[in-house]
Amino acid sequence: AILLGVLFCAGCQTLPVHTKYDPIGYKPKNPGNVVIKVSLQDRMVYVMEGNRPLLVTATAIGLPTKPTPKGRFRVTNKIATKRSGSYGFWVKGDTIVAGTSSKAPGAGYRYVGYPMQYWVEFLSAYGFHVGSVWPVPRTHGCLRLHQNAAREFFQLARIGTPVYIAQTQPEDATLGKDPPRPHDYNDPDPPKSLLISPRAFKDDPTQDLREQS
């Protein structure tokens, strides 16, 4: 299930909003010194400014058959309301069919990609984005972030920010030792009618970065 945590107006459908998992992100003193580290073993993301953690959050990683790439990268693109170019839905009137962009179910359908909010790309077709943070490898190589952490991560990541992805990170022994993790990964998927609409993208200003003490 992909958690979007979107709230509608009265009379509309309401999706569950989970507040138990809510990592705190802090503004950097020098944005040019920010580094993003990913531990595949512990499935954790550490956004660091020197030795100071700005955001520590769980992530979902790629399947063994579609692994998250390891290496040293840099942020190359950011799109707050990105949709997948590969996976999504085919729409014709009130009919919505899940599928891939390469295979339409018939004539007259239009393709709408799956929402990948707060997209932060570090390699062509690979990036961080909102999604269910499963405790086991689950993605096609991208790194999913919880809705309550993705906005802050998006604010911290700038074009050119270094991204280091490795099996382990030094921070695993301290920041990543028994961290809280989200438990809402198995929530039911939102309705397809929501996922194809602009309402799939939630922008919550309460998730802004905080000032460092």
Identify the role of each PLM range.
Residues 3, 31, 138-139:
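Alpha-helical hydrophobic/aromatic positions enriched in membrane-embedded helices and signal peptides
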Residues 40-44, 48-79:
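Glycine-rich catalytic cores of cysteine/serine-nucleophile enzymes that process amide/ester linkages
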Residues 1-10:
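Bacterial N-terminal signal peptides
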Residues 12, 16-17, 24, 70, ...:
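Exported/periplasmic cell-wall-interacting domains
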Residues 18-48:
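Post-signal peptide N-terminal segment of mature Sec-exported envelope proteins
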Residues 51, 81, 169-172:
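Short, charged beta-turn/beta-strand-edge "cap" motif at the junction between a beta-strand
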Residues 83-87:
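Non-transmembrane, membrane-adjacent beta-strand/coil modules in membrane-associated proteins
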Residues 80-82, 125:
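Short, charged/polar surface micro-motifs in flexible loops or helix N-caps
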